[in-house]
């Protein structure tokens, strides 16, 4: 979904991992995108950083924004297993079901595209599940990196398979990066 409507507030934040784009509708986060730019393996990858556009958010939205940054940094440092910030998911009924089911995959666990299709009641819709996850508007928060191919291989990932491997290793879903070739 495109968040170019005036009802959305977009704020850019940079940490040691790179550039992040947060999009809010009121006090709910509806978009989080990672543009990269830094080596995610860096020991300083989770350093807190001031947002580049602090003045764009005020009041309760500012509180949620700061909570989102804090939770994101804690997660990227391996110290947070589940996000608690309020979110809003946009999409068709099918897409919403897929994204909500993906949020229920526990930290350190994986599901296959096929298993997710079965969970949402469309057992033959593996490809549609993959397309929905490819367009995940809340990267990291909706943990589509926890969805792997039926052969238990890495599968695709919008942010790149190297990052997917790193996240799954950090979560302990695989013992090492070579387990997902």
Spans of features found by a protein language model:
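Basic nucleic-acid-binding alpha-helical/helix-turn surface characteristic of O6-alkylguanine DNA
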Residues: 1-123, 170, 174-181
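Regulatory, non-catalytic segments
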Residues: 124-136
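Major-groove DNA-recognition helix of helix-turn-helix-type DNA-binding domains
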Residues: 141
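Short cysteine clusters
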Residues: 144
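…primarily DNA-binding HTH/wHTH and HhH modules…
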Residues: 150-181
């Amino acid at each position: 979904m495109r968040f170019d409507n005036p009802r959305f507030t977009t704020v850019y934040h940079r940490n040691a991992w790179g550039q992040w784009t947060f999009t809010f509708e009121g006090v709910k986060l509806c978009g989080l995108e990672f543009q990269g730019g830094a080596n995610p393996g860096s020991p300083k990858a989770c350093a807190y950083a001031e947002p580049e556009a602090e003045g764009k958010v005020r009041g309760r939205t500012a509180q949620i924004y700061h909570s989102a940054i804090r939770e994101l940094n804690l997660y990227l440092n391996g110290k947070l297993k589940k996000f608690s910030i309020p979110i809003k998911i946009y999409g068709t009924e099918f897409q919403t079901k897929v994204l909500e089911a993906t949020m229920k995959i526990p930290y350190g666990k994986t599901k296959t595209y096929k298993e997710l299709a079965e969970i949402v009641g469309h057992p033959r819709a593996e490809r549609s599940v993959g397309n929905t996850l490819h367009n995940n508007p809340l990267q990291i928060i909706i943990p589509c990196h926890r969805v792997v191919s039926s052969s238990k291989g890495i599968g695709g990932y919008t942010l790149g398979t190297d990052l997917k491997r790193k996240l799954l290793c950090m979560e302990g879903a695989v013992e090492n990066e070579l387990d997902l070739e």
